[in-house]
């Protein structure tokens, strides 16, 4: 029996609500361990609704209509989001708009809604490394992406940042209870 599965929900690594009103967006294969834990199991544990993407072609439209409170994305998804934003707002123009306080607030709000992340309380990446520069880029848009690390062998969540610390550069946090980490 993997005690990681038993201890993780008590630590609430995604900081989801216990009110049953959480909203999750499912698009990874259902046998993917991150999909199982971050979406399915967390929803069953804390309550909420799981919405599924209809197809790869409707992914953005589906995510935009769902506006989940918890979103897990592999780094490639965030790269595609970033490329989409930069195709409409080249970096120089985006920097200029973000430097104007009122415009910056409105732009961040609109972009988060377009991305489907306007209601997200937990925005997580994992399954592959995400460049710190990309996380900083998103942070400048008001989108704080938490880095996670785990593997199938320990039921997905191996490490997490403690308490209210949701972002620390180049860190995936401390080992979960009952998880031993050895670096050779």
Model segments located where?
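Conserved AMP-binding/adenylate-forming
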Residues: 71, 107-184
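Active-site-adjacent beta-strand anchor residues
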Residues: 27, 52-53, 124, 148
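Conserved AMP-binding/adenylation subdomain of ANL enzymes
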Residues: 2-23, 30-110, 119
